């Protein structure tokens, strides 16, 4: 958390071997049929989503979300892109500029900033020390190949474990503070 007011959290769903999508860019493996009876009840996703002030994502993640079915509702969504994209969604804003200025505005305006992807966006936010936390939902699958979430990250970064929860659906959520 920065200044006690806002948090920028990088979130990802990943296979146990660290991939966020298959080689063909599919994410059909996100639906797990695993069962872990000793796990915590599956989280109340709807209640959690109400705590997010805005989403931040790259254009590839945005385009994937449109193809799969928009799950972000009317929550403000900022899409980082160098391309000239258009949308009919009133809550989507395209941005190409200084990330420090953008994050300052988003922290002030929305408080909770949830980085929904992708790998290049996450790497840049960590490199610039603009993100506060990383939340990884590890799914019970090994993909062997595809896109790794931290594929573009090229430096050492120390983290502090904030918590871990194993859920009944076999997903393990791990939360880290990014040490600055």
Regions found by a protein language model. Give the residues of each.
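Enzymes that bind and transform nitrogen-containing heteroaromatic metabolites
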Residues: 1-180
């Amino acid at each position: 958390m920065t200044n006690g007011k806002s948090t920028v959290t990088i979130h990802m769903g990943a296979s146990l071997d660290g991939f966020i999508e298959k080689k063909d860019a599919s994410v059909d493996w996100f639906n797990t049929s695993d069962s872990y009876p000793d796990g915590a009840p599956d989280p109340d996703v709807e209640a959690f989503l109400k705590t997010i002030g805005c989403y931040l994502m790259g254009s590839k993640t945005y385009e994937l979300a449109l193809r799969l079915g928009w799950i972000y509702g009317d929550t403000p969504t900022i899409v980082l892109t160098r391309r000239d994209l258009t949308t009919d969604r009133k809550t989507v804003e395209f941005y190409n500029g200084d990330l420090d200025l953008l994050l300052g505005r988003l922290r002030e305006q929305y408080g909770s900033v949830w980085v929904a992807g992708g790998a290049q966006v996450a790497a840049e936010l960590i490199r610039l020390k603009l993100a506060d936390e990383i939340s990884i939902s590890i799914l019970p699958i090994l993909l062997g190949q595809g896109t790794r979430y931290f594929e573009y990250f090229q430096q050492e970064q120390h983290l502090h474990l904030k918590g871990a929860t194993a859920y009944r659906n076999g997903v393990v959520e791990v939360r880290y503070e990014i040490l600055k």
